[in-house]
Amino acid sequence: MNNTIETILAHRSIRKFTAVPITDEQRQTIIQAGLAASSSSMLQVVSIVRVTDSEKRNELAQFAGNQAYVESAAEFLVFCIDYQRHATINPDVQADFTELTLIGAVDSGIMAQNCLLAAESMGLGGVYIGGLRNSAAQVDELLGLPENSAVLFGMCLGHPDQNPEVKPRLPAHVVVHENQYQELNLDDIQSYDQTMQAYYASRTSNQKLSTWSQEVTGKLAGESRPHILPYLNSKGLAKR
């Protein structure tokens, strides 16, 4: 197993950081790794807003659900769909197709994971902040995003000040299907629930008595940010 694979498999979300800054060289390398990511049809429809202003960091932390590490991380990056670049080049660009919004979301995720993997390869850590979408319009206004662009998620990066366990994932045979979709075997989920129950009960922080099935059922039982589609539409995206 090479160093790249070891780094990927050792991924943990880091939510507590030291006060040590990320160097300019490290930051530039992380960004270059992101820019090297695959891009659908070479459209390059992602923009990153690096937030260094402490007041804006404080507001973003509140918008994300009072996640203090948005303020304390050495770096905070916000990943956005961006077709305004293209509309500036050619005003006839039709950015309102849902397909283009999906491309922007997919490419943003690919770019962000490249950034995070590059950071982790340097001994840094990070965590995604999807909670920005709780207040997408307010975040959008704070960052001054133009038409044809939209906020997707944030990313905290810094030197880890914690050493959490690696969270067990679903087994590959549950996730990977051969030739066609296979019906779920609930015995596999029951076994995984036992694994996750042991993990939740024994991890070093935020211990709880729960299973994966209970967690995802609670998460998916109600509405999930119903304001997102109107927000995207208001930015000229995902209209048709």
Curated annotation (Swiss-Prot):
Indicate the transmembrane segments per the record: none
Pfam families reported for this sequence: Nitroreductase
Listed under GO biological process in this entry are: bioluminescence
Q: Which residues bind FMN?
A: 11-15, 39, 67-69, 128-131, 167-169
Q: How does it assemble?
A: Homodimer.
Renumbered to this chain, the signal peptide range is none
Into which family does the record put it?
Answer: Belongs to the flavin oxidoreductase frp family.
Q: Which terms are listed as keywords in the entry?
A: Flavoprotein, FMN, Luminescence, NADP, Oxidoreductase
* Entry EC number(s): 1.5.1.38
Q: What does this protein do?
A: Catalyzes the NADPH-dependent reduction of FMN to FMNH(2). Involved in bioluminescence by providing FMNH(2) to luciferase.
What Gene Ontology molecular-function terms does this entry list?
FMN reductase (NADPH) activity
**Lineage from the top down?**
Bacteria, Pseudomonadati, Pseudomonadota, Gammaproteobacteria, Vibrionales
Corresponding gene?
frp
Q: What is this protein called?
A: NADPH-flavin oxidoreductase
Q: Name the source's superkingdom.
A: Bacteria
Q: Its catalytic activity?
A: FMNH2 + NADP(+) = FMN + NADPH + 2 H(+)
